Amino acid sequence: MAGGVKGIGKFFGDVVAEMKRVSWPTRKELTRYTLVVLGTVAFITVFFAVVDYGISALVRGLIE
């Protein structure tokens, strides 16, 4: 085992040190980003539902 227990301890120590250097978003930014993601997901969901319905109607029309 290269490093062993000391290696694992150093790894987690480095992780903690790196997490302290991270620039975390404010609550306001986080809320805004979350709403943007949810809005984008909703838009894409509706878009693909409409496209799916259109293709289904087209195929049904060709079959009948």
Curated annotation (Swiss-Prot):
The keyword Membrane applies. GO terms for biological process: intracellular protein transmembrane transport; protein secretion; protein targeting; protein transport by the Sec complex. One of its GO terms (molecular function) is protein transmembrane transporter activity. It is a single-pass membrane protein. It is found in: Cell membrane. The keyword Transmembrane helix applies. Component of the Sec protein translocase complex. Heterotrimer consisting of SecY, SecE and SecG subunits. The heterotrimers can form oligomers, although 1 heterotrimer is thought to be able to translocate proteins. Interacts with the ribosome. Interacts with SecDF, and other proteins may be involved. Interacts with SecA. Belongs to the SecE/SEC61-gamma family. This is Protein translocase subunit SecE. The gene is secE.
